[in-house]
Design a protein with these regions (language model features):
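Short, charged, amphipathic alpha-helical segments
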Residues: 10, 35-46
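N-terminal acidic leader/helix
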Residues: 1-34, 51, 56
Length: 60
């Protein structure tokens, strides 16, 4: 059961990491298109990072 929990947490971390990378890429693209307001993404990225680190603590 513990192995399944660790596998699930690892999978969640991978998905959170992918989401963070995607948000960062969108933010980078907005440098080319400053008229697009993506300020809400900064908050979303912070939330994802927090979740990522909480999961890391659970794995330890």
């Amino acid at each position: 059961m513990n192995n399944k929990k660790n596998y699930d947490l690892k999978l969640i971390k991978q998905k959170l990491n992918a989401a963070m990378v995607l948000i960062e890429e969108v933010q980078n693209l907005t440098e080319e298109f400053p008229e697009v307001n993506t300020s809400y993404l900064a908050g979303a990225l912070d939330d994802l990072e927090q979740q990522y680190y909480e999961i890391e603590e659970l794995q330890d």
